[in-house]
């Protein structure tokens, strides 16, 4: 059993402890960020620097097997559909740039309209009202022609579809008639082949 300590010894032991008086500024992170000299603020890097031997090994592996693609993607970048989410049938989410429309190379109407409307803000600097009205009229005319062409294309597409359906229906109708005629011919042949039986009467 250890000998009992006196009160004086205990007091001396506690009084002789060294105490650090640290300012509250350093303890509070928000206040510490405002200091001019920020002591020990940068966190240590978790990535260890490779030794020369490890670097050599790594380079040899790359030469042998090729470098790995170290790019990592987050979930939101991969456009994975969310689980437990109702998917509306028939609605397909658009991808790519919005409002991007491609013009055919031989589409002179659209190209002319675009050229005239793009030059609009540069030409209006020094042009008279008459010139401006003439140019705007040209743009309107080109737009009208474009609309007419679109309507005509729609109409042609619809007519083509109608003709296709009509031709399909006529082919099906002809096939049905042919089958019906063949069936009738078979029935007639079967009727000719069967000889009618003679009636017999027996007396008891």
Swiss-Prot record:
Bias kind Basic and acidic residues: ranges: 142-167
Keywords for this protein: Coiled coil, mRNA transport, Nucleus, Ribosome biogenesis, Transport
Coiled-coil stretches noted in the UniProt entry, renumbered to this chain: 118-169
Swiss-Prot/TrEMBL GO biological process terms: intracellular mRNA localization; mRNA transport; ribosomal large subunit biogenesis
GO CC, any one term: nucleolus
Location(s) in or outside the cell: Nucleus, Nucleolus
Region (Disordered): 1-24, 142-204
Domain of life: Eukaryota
Function: Required for efficient assembly and nuclear export of the 60S ribosomal subunit.
Subunit structure and binding partners: Component of the 66S pre-ribosomal particle.
Protein name stated in the entry: 60S ribosomal subunit assembly/export protein LOC1
